[in-house]
Amino acid sequence: MGLLAYLLVVLLILNVFFAAVTVFLERRDTSATWAWLLVLTFVPIFGFIIYLIFGRKLSGKKIFDWKGQEKIGIQESTANQIEMIRQKEFPFSDSNVKKHRDLIYLLLVNDGAILTQDNEVELFIDGHEKFDALIADIEKAKDHIHLIYYIFHSDELGNRLMRVLERKAAEGLNVKIIYDAMGSRTTKKSFFRTFEKNGGLVRPFFPSKLPLINFRLNYRNHRKLAIIDGDISYIGGFNIGDEYLGLSKKFGYWRDTHLRVHGKAVYAMQTRFIMDWNSASSTNKIDYKPRYFPTFHGKGHTSMQIVSSGPDSEWQQIKNGYIKMINAAKKTIYLQSPYFIPDASLLEAIKIAALSGVDVRVMIPNKPDHAFVYRATTNYAGELMETGAKIFIYDNGFIHAKTLVVDGEIASVGTANMDFRSFRLNFEVNAFIYEKKMVQKLEDAFLEDILKSYQLTPELYAKRSLWIKFKEAVSRLLSPIL
């Protein structure tokens, strides 16, 4: 045996040994473990490099600092709500909110998600309307503007927004931007130069610490939040880019869901931004000052909780909320997600609901955003049809909304897709809503989307080619790590 062949054998043995040790020592889902073992076995050496970049769990080092929240009474308010609900003394605003106190309690205990009941909420399903409203609110800002977006493109929409932010920073307002280093990888730092020169501050989330190498590449901040003067906020699925206005030739019309909130729920989104900023920035840390949490009384009646989740937590708070909602369903479950790759627990919950006679409708796109992810999505959809669930293919552009509406009584809107990545790898944020009027608007939007969709029937699904079936099988196998 030549020296080169000998070294290759040694490398292969070491690859298998270290790969197995590394994968099994890290606490993770069994399906993800098997998926990584397949990659490491069939793509030796290079597969281990892929694993080091994409597969390693985050270190045990604390990512977010909770210190300072006692100044505005967050922990005290959370503890008080937990105790009052436990003692059945909490003053729920109406019978529908009270009916779902188990879900509210779960999210309180799991995530510290305080229930607020004074919110005015406006629904946006069109990018033009959402960004017109956001920019109008930014124009009226008097004290501060906080933005966090997974994608912040330097295209026409990005420039339009940036010009306003530059002007507000020059006026002396406190303006801060967080963008995800991977999601906004095509946006050059020079795009923010004038903004920073005018006094604005910008930070990338989880940037590479080494040239061309980022061992945290797989963990992305997928949140989309805007907080203006501490009393108005935006949460939902729209990123900043021309494609979100329907200007992409590939995707066409972009259908998404976003909320504008005025009420105490803004405090929770402000807290989320501060924690993310202080994690992303080594300087110019934000303290929990009264200016960021102004005293006001919301005039709305929408009860909601703001729930965050991410790889820094073992609890998968948003997914647990989804499962609790699905298990509570008696009549209808309407679900929209561009990526439908549920883990075993979520898939089982949806199947049981469908088999129990609940009208389960799942809406997915008619075109791939990511090829492997799309084929995994259609494979899971095919399996779900066997239980009587109805699958609808949105045929009026691209559906990017992440919404779950149950029984016309409760709903969730936010950034989390129905997939492994959103539940285990990404930092996400969702609003859980308990007011019937707002939930009805979301249900109406879903039913309107059905008119622009076609149903994927078992007969239609059976006609897919052998090549498509093969791609689905491979994608399904790798779905835990996509």
UniProtKB/Swiss-Prot annotation:
SUPFAM superfamilies: Phospholipase D/nuclease (SSF56024). Its EC number is 2.7.8.-. The active site is at H222, K224, D229, H400, K402, D407. The chain crosses the membrane at residues 4-24, 34-54. InterPro entries: Cardiolipin_synth_Firmi, Cardiolipin_synthase, CLS_N, PLD-like_dom, PLipase_D/transphosphatidylase. GO terms for biological process: cardiolipin biosynthetic process. Keywords: Cell membrane, Lipid biosynthesis, Lipid metabolism, Membrane, Phospholipid biosynthesis, Phospholipid metabolism, Repeat, Transferase, Transmembrane, Transmembrane helix. Pfam families: PLDc_2, PLDc_N. Catalyzes the reversible phosphatidyl group transfer from one phosphatidylglycerol molecule to another to form cardiolipin (CL) (diphosphatidylglycerol) and glycerol. PANTHER family: CARDIOLIPIN SYNTHASE, PHOSPHOLIPASE D. Belongs to the phospholipase D family. Cardiolipin synthase subfamily. This is Cardiolipin synthase. It comes from Listeria welshimeri serovar 6b (strain ATCC 35897 / DSM 20650 / CCUG 15529 / CIP 8149 / NCTC 11857 / SLCC 5334 / V8). The lineage of its organism: Bacteria, Bacillati, Bacillota, Bacilli, Bacillales. The gene is cls.
